[in-house]
């Protein structure tokens, strides 16, 4: 298990994605961080209020948190007002357990989004600027531009697209490697069956965050492995690479 103080996005971090912070204990053997989906928790009436759940979270002995409050227009579950959605993120970032906040790239392009990012950074959390395409993979030049812009507006640029061909997956890996060469800190993956393997190999090309649900039935994006499976595959691949080198 990784302590909050020890986490650095200079190296790869594996995040267990969940709407229920009680999943942390099951994830702690495999994950470095928990991605807490406020939008999914807020939409599920059987779960505690997400901000209350963060307040009750024992950060001293638990994994640190990335908080995400994804709107419906970016594939999430939050259907309320933008100002309320972002205020939840600002409030969440004030808790010691929260080390990173995910905000959509389109939101960060607005003046209000930039102000929200400043407020969150003032609380000590970093910004993950995320962009998603749930239907296709853009051309290489678009991938480079979108990922670089995300890395500039955020502290980490996150790009998730949908692979319709194996070549799409290769383009994502190429964009990841190029971004790393430019000095950008990025997290990348290709969603869908044809992009599933990128979740395992992207760290070799410079991706700094991987995402997986604790339970495969709770996947928050197409093509996700469960946290145990992804952790074991990445560990095997990384150790094999070290031995080959």
UniProtKB/Swiss-Prot annotation:
It holds the Pfam family DHquinase_I. 3-dehydroquinate binds at residues 35-37, 70, 199, 220, 224. The active site is at 132 (proton donor/acceptor), 158 (schiff-base intermediate with substrate). Pathway: Metabolic intermediate biosynthesis; chorismate biosynthesis; chorismate from D-erythrose 4-phosphate and phosphoenolpyruvate: step 3/7. GO terms for molecular function: 3-dehydroquinate dehydratase activity. InterPro entries: Aldolase_TIM, DHquinase_I, Type-I_3-dehydroquinase. Its EC number is 4.2.1.10. One of its GO terms (biological process) is aromatic amino acid family biosynthetic process. It catalyses: 3-dehydroquinate = 3-dehydroshikimate + H2O. Keywords: Amino-acid biosynthesis, Aromatic amino acid biosynthesis, Lyase, Schiff base. Involved in the third step of the chorismate pathway, which leads to the biosynthesis of aromatic amino acids. Catalyzes the cis-dehydration of 3-dehydroquinate (DHQ) and introduces the first double bond of the aromatic ring to yield 3-dehydroshikimate. Homodimer. PANTHER family: 3-DEHYDROQUINATE DEHYDRATASE (PTHR43699:SF1). Belongs to the type-I 3-dehydroquinase family. This is 3-dehydroquinate dehydratase. It comes from Haloquadratum walsbyi (strain DSM 16790 / HBSQ001). The gene is aroD.
